[in-house]
Amino acid sequence: MKIAYIMYPGACYMGAGDGTKMQAEIWARELERKGHIVDRINPWGHYDWKSYDVVHVFGLGLWNYDMIHWGSGINPNFVFSPIIDTNTPMWQYKLATYSGCGKLRLYSQNYALRQLKPDIKLFLARTQYEADYLQRGYGIQKDKISIIPLSFREIHYDSSIKKEPFCLFVGTMTQPRKNIPRLIEAARKYHFPLKLVGNKGNSESENRLRALIGDASNIEIIGFVNDEELATLYNQAKVFALPSLNEGVGLVALEAAICGCNIVITNLGGPKEYYEGESVELVNPYDVDDIGKAILRALENNTAQPQLRETLIKNYNVSACVDKLIDSYQLLHT
C-alpha cells in the first residue's frame, strides 16, 4: 500500500517527544519495514493525492475541516486518528459537537468533526474509552471505528542494571494535565526520591516548579535527556508514575514498564485498559495521598515484574499492533 501521513500542525513545536508524532512515526517505520510506502506529508511538498491507498490524518483541530473536506474530494480513502484525551462528561462533550453554524463559518473543532463524518471512511481509537467518545459524542457508527492499540518504542532493556529506589516521571512538566504539582506534593509529603524528566518550560516555568519543590532534597528536575540517557533512567528506576488528570495512553509508561519499572498510573481515561489484570497501581490523580501511598507500595513491590513486562511485549509489540492497523486500512477497499 501507499499511505500518506498528515500530522497536526502544532506537532512542529513539540519536538520528538510528542506522543502523537511518536505514535505515527512508530507505525510508519514498521509499515515501511513490512514493505509499504509511507509519505510524511510536508505542506511545502507536492503530492499525487489520487495515488494513495490511504490518507491518514493525526490530531483533532479546526484545521481538520478544510484539510479533510477538500482532500476527500480528491481521494475518498481518509482515515482519522483524532487523539481524544478528555474527562469531560459525555453529555457536555456531545453538546459541544453541535455548537456551530456552517453557513456562518462558526466552527469549534468538535462541531467541525461532526460535520466531517461523511468525509472520513474510518476512525481509529487507541482505547475503548476513546472509541466511546467517538460513538456516543459524535454519533459515529460503530462499524466506522477500529481500536488500534499503541505500541511501545524499542527501548534497550538491560536486566543487569540494578533497580534503584526512586520514582521517575517523563513528560512535559508545564502541562497542567500532567499533574506535576500534586506529584511533587506527594513526594514532599511521603519522602520518596522523585526524578522529573522532560520539558520543564522556560525559566519562569522552571522557577515555579522549584518553588513547589522548595527545600525538598529528594526531588530532582533533570529536564531534557537524549534517548540513550532516557533508556538508562528507565532501567534504573524502580517505579514510573504518570498520575495525569487526563491521558490518552501514556506511551512513556509502556516504555518504562518494558524496562522493568513498576507502574503507578491515573485511574481516569483509557490508560488503565493497557494494564488490565496486571499488578499496577491505579490512582485518583486528584488525591495527593492516594498518589503518594501508591508510589510507596510500588517501591516495595518485588512481584509485579517481570510478568508485567512480558505481558506488554506480547500484547503491544509494534509488529502485532501494525498488523491490526494494516487490517483496518484494508477495510477501506473491501
What are these regions (language model features)?
Residues G19-M22, E300-L331:
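A charged, aromatic-enriched C-terminal amphipathic alpha-helix characteristic of glycosyltransferases
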Residues G102-F123, D132:
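Membrane-proximal helix-turn-helix segments that form the acceptor-binding/catalytic region
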Residues S160-K178, I184-H191, K195:
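Conserved donor-binding/catalytic core segment of Leloir-type glycosyltransferases
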Residues L245:
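Aromatic "clamp/platform" in nucleotide-sugar-dependent glycosyltransferases that forms part
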Residues N262-I265:
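Short hydrophobic beta-strand element within catalytic cores of glycosyltransferases
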